[in-house]
């Protein structure tokens, strides 16, 4: 199966932000969609600063979306927003925790500074990025769809 790279862009990040913002609330539990949208430009700036130095290289769609979602969740939580209770389930909380932990681990370790090679293996759902002698990031998809 041919490997088709995509590139992370600020537009990708904005799309992901808009897809998840509707179910976030402020610390008082009130839906704050319009307020968060006012924060969108600042959040996008942080997402952009996070993406471009490290991820302006071809990566797969699944990894791109996961990294954007996880990082945006980190940014929203840092601003005091919480998931809307109606949208939460035990499964979604556990999945989000795994995803965010994985994104933070990769960010903190610097493991996601991608090298020149990218490989996608079918069947096992494993993504490996990096180059010989360089940093390599490996993602396996669980039955719940979390990457880490």
Role assignments for model-derived ranges:
Residues 53, 65-89:
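Ordered, amphipathic secondary-structure segments that act as subunit-interaction surfaces
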Residues 42, 46, 71, 75-79, ...:
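Generic beta-strand or strand-like secondary-structure segments
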Residues 1-67, 128-148:
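Conserved short "hinge" loops at termini or chain/domain junctions
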Residues 3-4, 78-148:
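Short loop/turn elements at secondary-structure junctions
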């Amino acid at each position: 199966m041919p490997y088709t790279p995509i590139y992370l862009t600020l537009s990708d990040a904005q799309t992901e932000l808009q897809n998840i913002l509707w179910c976030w609330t402020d610390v008082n539990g009130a839906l704050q969609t319009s307020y968060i949208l006012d924060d969108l430009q600042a959040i996008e700036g942080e997402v952009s600063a996070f993406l471009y130095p490290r991820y302006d290289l071809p990566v797969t769609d699944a990894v791109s979306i996961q990294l954007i979602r996880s990082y945006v969740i980190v940014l929203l939580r840092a601003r005091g927003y919480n998931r809307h209770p109606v949208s939460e389930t035990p499964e979604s909380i556990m999945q989000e925790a795994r995803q965010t932990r994985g994104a933070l681990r990769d960010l903190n370790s610097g493991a996601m500074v991608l090298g020149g090679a990218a490989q996608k293996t079918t069947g096992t759902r494993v993504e490996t990025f990096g180059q010989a002698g360089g940093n390599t990031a490996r993602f396996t998809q669980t039955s719940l769809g979390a990457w880490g």
